[in-house]
Amino acid sequence: MSKFRLAVVQLHVSKIKADNLGRAQTLVKEAAGQGAKVVVLPECFNSPYGTGFFKEYAEKIPGESTQVLSETAKKCGIYLVGGSIPEEDGGKLYNTCSVFGPDGTLLVTHRKIHLFDIDVPGKIRFQESETLSPGKSLSMFETPYCKVGVGICYDIRFAELAQIYAKKGCQLLVYPGAFNMTTGPAHWELLQRGRAVDNQVYVATASPARDETASYVAWGHSSVINPWGEVISKAGSEESVVYADIDLQYLADVRQQIPITKQRRNDLYSVNSVQEG
């Protein structure tokens, strides 16, 4: 199958977990009704994003939120990339994405590898490492359409991760993320287009909708980028669902026209993983 429909859900996230889960279910079902075979939710879709919230909203996996994701994926018959939730395991907290198949089976969990620790003077300081621990493995899953690589937000800044995913056969990279009002306008689209062009893959990002009253204001603008680096679908700042038809024949054509995979100087350099999930 050379084409399939992808949906990205840009969800409004509140402090009420039950509301977030209910709204996520509704929008995922809406997306499936529009023919989406793969649906992506945003980072921290079940809770506010912030170091002060991670412990309060943390769950075990399996738990309440992942049970909702599993049931929704099965009911809709889709692959559901469950954004991320704060996960508690063994006394540690993680920022974790769970992916479910059309039968409701948990396919993979991706714990955010690169923690968001930044300090831009006069604009934003954020230290995920104050409360979270980093993941230690790569995360990929198979579908009948293509192989998919998973990252979370800050992971997109690290080109090596995307290169390894592409090298291992991924044709779609998904990044639930919550860039902010400083990094969003500067780097959000730039990084997505860069990862897509560098690796000649599709890239999809899912952000929470923007809430100006929140302690952490997300940029929004969830997007899908094609292997040529074009933005083929993009949300605004409000809650919405955006769709894109992923055309794997087009991907193959781009790779044939500009054959960088064959032209790489593997005798001079290489990017390899040392640990996998």
UniProtKB/Swiss-Prot annotation:
InterPro entries: C-N_Hydrolase, C-N_Hydrolase_sf, Nit1/2_C-N_Hydrolase. Its EC number is 3.5.1.3. It catalyses: 2-oxoglutaramate + H2O = 2-oxoglutarate + NH4(+); 2-oxosuccinamate + H2O = oxaloacetate + NH4(+). The active site is at residues 43, 112, 153. One of its GO terms (molecular function) is 2-oxoglutaramate amidase activity. One of its GO terms (biological process) is asparagine metabolic process. Has omega-amidase activity. The role of omega-amidase is to remove potentially toxic intermediates by converting 2-oxoglutaramate and 2-oxosuccinamate to biologically useful 2-oxoglutarate and oxaloacetate, respectively. This is Omega-amidase NIT2. It comes from Danio rerio (Zebrafish). The gene is nit2.
